[in-house]
Amino acid sequence: MACPRPLSQCDHTPLPGPPAGHWPLPLSRRRREMKSNKEQRSAVFVILFALITILILYSSSSANEVFHYGSLRGRTRRPVNLRKWSITDGYIPILGNKTLPSRCGQCVIVTSSSHLLGTKLGPEIERAECTIRMNDAPTTGYSADVGNKTTFRVVAHSSVFHVLRRPQEFVNRTPETVFIFWGPPNKMQKPQGSLVRVIQRAGLVFPNMEAYAISLSRMRQFDDLFRSETGKDREKSHSWLSTGWFTMVIAVELCDHVHVYGMVPPDYCSLRPHLQRMPYHYYEPKGPDECVTYIQNENSRKGNHHRFITEKRVFSSWAQLYGITFSHPSWT
């Protein structure tokens, strides 16, 4: 813009621009500097990404520390003696007024694991004084490996209909079976359509059927036991106790010695070859992989999940205390 005053009064400060005698940088040099700046920005981005990733992993680990059992359990505390729990208070007869049989010397727990396939353990399992099975794990077609004898069958609320829809398999095939059903009160005893009523109606059709439900007070004891053993509240940690948890405690209550077939150790999935696939259930060959199931449930924070690996760590700590042995695979 032209100066409106006399020329001598005008400011002759040069406009912003390159200093006198300096020319713009050559194009090649400018490109090198732009490339260097881009590389610096990329390096900063990589560093920030790494830091954020570390923070996320640390946060996830902290949130999931509920399942790092080894660092949580108080080593000096006195363990709960499960054999002193009152059986008469813990199990309510659904059919009739019987009392749950109170004692077996030698018990076996036959898990639903595919590790049992091909073992030919059927005759050995048949010789046990008491045999305990879970949910709707069948024996028909698998008896060579898992036997037929079923003294107790522990059934989750979610498996009630699976069991009752196949009475020829689960009721008539082994009429000596004692059923123990477990579930939250809103599932087992809600006013409309309770599962207890469903089981009672089944008892009218099969009068020899013997069934019990775990009492509300005993359900609280199971929750308290989880907190005592892991240091974490079950509900606050978004955990569901598995049927295996209930079965193991019931076995310890009822039996002097317990032999568990097919349960893998807690570190199994961290040691197993990644390409080896094992179905979660022996009767579902195309079902989910066992380690995928264990790890997803163990590490999930959204919703409620079974903490299978944590439970196995607890069982390992009970082995010597309660005379529990594990085989196929063998571990302690």
UniProtKB/Swiss-Prot annotation:
GO MF: alpha-N-acetylgalactosaminide alpha-2,6-sialyltransferase activity
Gene name for this UniProt entry: ST6GALNAC6
Glycosylation sites: 97
EC nos: 2.4.99.-
Known catalytic reactions: a ganglioside GM1b (d18:1(4E)) + CMP-N-acetyl-beta-neuraminate = a ganglioside GD1alpha (d18:1(4E)) + CMP + H(+); N-acetyl-alpha-neuraminosyl-(2->3)-beta-D-galactosyl-(1->3)-N-acetyl-beta-D-glucosaminyl-(1->3)-beta-D-galactosyl-(1->4)-beta-D-glucosyl-(1<->1')-N-acyl-sphing-4-enine + CMP-N-acetyl-beta-neuraminate = N-acetyl-alpha-neuraminosyl-(2->3)-beta-D-galactosyl-(1->3)-[N-acetyl-alpha-neuraminosyl-(2->6)]-N-acetyl-beta-D-glucosaminyl-(1->3)-beta-D-galactosyl-(1->4)-beta-D-glucosyl-(1<->1')-N-acyl-sphing-4-enine + CMP + H(+); a globoside MSGG + CMP-N-acetyl-beta-neuraminate = a globoside DSGG + CMP + H(+); a ganglioside GD1a (d18:1(4E)) + CMP-N-acetyl-beta-neuraminate = a ganglioside GT1aalpha (d18:1(4E)) + CMP + H(+)
InterPro entries: Glyco_trans_29, GT29-like_sf
Transmembrane segments: 43-63
Matching CDD domains: GT29_ST6GALNAC6
The organism of origin for this protein: Bos taurus
Enzyme's top EC category: transferase
Role: Transfers the sialyl group (N-acetyl-alpha-neuraminyl or NeuAc) from CMP-NeuAc onto glycoproteins and glycolipids, forming an alpha-2,6-linkage. Produces branched type disialyl structures by transfer of a sialyl group onto the GalNAc or GlcNAc residue inside backbone core chains having a terminal sialic acid with an alpha-2,3-linkage on Gal. ST6GalNAcVI prefers glycolipids to glycoproteins, predominantly catalyzing the biosynthesis of ganglioside GD1alpha from GM1b.
Biological processes, Gene Ontology terms: ganglioside biosynthetic process; oligosaccharide metabolic process; protein glycosylation
Localization per Swiss-Prot or TrEMBL: Golgi apparatus membrane
Keywords carried by this UniProt record: Disulfide bond, Glycoprotein, Glycosyltransferase, Golgi apparatus, Lipid metabolism, Membrane, Sialic acid, Signal-anchor, Transferase, Transmembrane, Transmembrane helix
Disulfide bonds: 107-255
CC annotations in GO: Golgi membrane
Name of this protein: Alpha-N-acetylgalactosaminide alpha-2,6-sialyltransferase 6
One Pfam family cited in the UniProt record for this chain: Glyco_transf_29
Origin organism lineage: Eukaryota, Metazoa, Chordata, Craniata, Vertebrata
Similarity section: Belongs to the glycosyltransferase 29 family.
Gene3D superfamilies: Glycosyl transferase family 29
